[in-house]
Regions:
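N-terminal secretory/targeting leader peptides
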Residues: 1-44, 53-268
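Helix-boundary and loop/linker segments of multi-pass membrane transporters
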Residues: 49-50
Length: 268
């Protein structure tokens, strides 16, 4: 969470990182960086960034820190690690799980779970030993690579919660010093990078899902009605975060308008 300042002061020329890390500076970073339970696929995130006002908001949000936001990518829809079958929203009641502090914890608490924050190095051991029964961790393929599915045999995929935006940003003075042709090359390069990395991750996710199912692991896929219900509950938490700053309110309004436009939220 220190790279924004490091890029702004020139200690670093740029960064590729999760936008949500900076939510301590302004809650708008959380609403723009990982709107929990909002999107179903990274292409929807890209549509919001490029055509729903997201890129412009992130550029405005980062400018006071001396940082120029070039564009965004995404991790892909994160899966969910679980030792017990969680097939609907109500199944989260009483489940002790690992989730990072912030909006994710707020939403899991709202649906009746008992989230705790654990350092990254302790998550696997906590799941293995039963300290927690589930964990908000990473994409399916990353969870697979780390061995989570050997100890937690009811992963939820596609995921139902997190899809972080990855921002590619540079020092504003360095950006302003570039000629227009190099700026255009970088902007298009970021778009190409975003599409490539998310497609690669999705293909690996699907391969690992197939491999795990062949081993008898139950990969839980929530029905649309439960995903929609999770999103509607999450809106209440988004609204709370929207009241914490002017930029957060603008981020919330832009996101919810876009989600209604693509049919992921009911029209008002």
């Amino acid at each position: 969470n220190e790279t924004l300042d490091a890029v702004g002061t020139g200690l670093l020329d740029g960064h590729i990182t999760a936008t949500v890390y900076f939510s301590g500076k302004d809650p708008a970073f959380a609403l723009l960086g990982d709107l929990i339970a909002a999107y179903e696929h990274p292409e929807q995130v890209f549509m919001f960034l490029r055509h729903g006002g997201g890129d412009a908001l992130l550029r405005e949000l980062m400018a006071p820190y001396g940082v120029h936001y070039i564009g965004g990518s995404a991790t892909g829809k994160e899966a969910f690690v679980s030792k017990i079958p969680i097939r609907r929203v109500d199944d989260f009641a009483g489940v002790k799980l690992r989730a990072p502090e912030g909006m994710a914890q707020d939403i899991f608490e709202r649906i009746g779970a008992a989230p705790v924050n654990l350092p990254a190095a302790e998550v696997y051991t906590a799941v293995e030993r039963g300290v927690v029964d589930a964990a908000d961790w990473a994409t399916y393929s990353m969870n697979h690579q780390l061995g989570f599915h050997a100890i937690a045999r009811y992963p939820i995929y596609p995921g139902i919660h997190s899809m972080p935006v990855i921002d590619i940003s540079v020092n504003a003075e360095k950006w302003n010093a570039l000629p227009d042709d190099l700026k255009a090359i970088l902007e298009m390069g970021v778009r190409d990078f975003a599409g490539d990395v998310t497609r690669r991750l999705e293909l690996q996710d699907l391969a690992d899902v197939a491999a795990d199912r062949a081993k008898g692991i139950e990969v839980v896929d929530w029905p649309k009605a439960e995903r929609d219900r999770m999103r509607e509950i999450a809106v209440e938490i988004w609204q709370d975060w929207a009241g914490r700053s002017k930029m957060a309110r603008r981020a919330y309004e832009a996101q919810t308008a876009f989600l209604r436009a693509i049919g992921l939220l009911a029209t008002e």
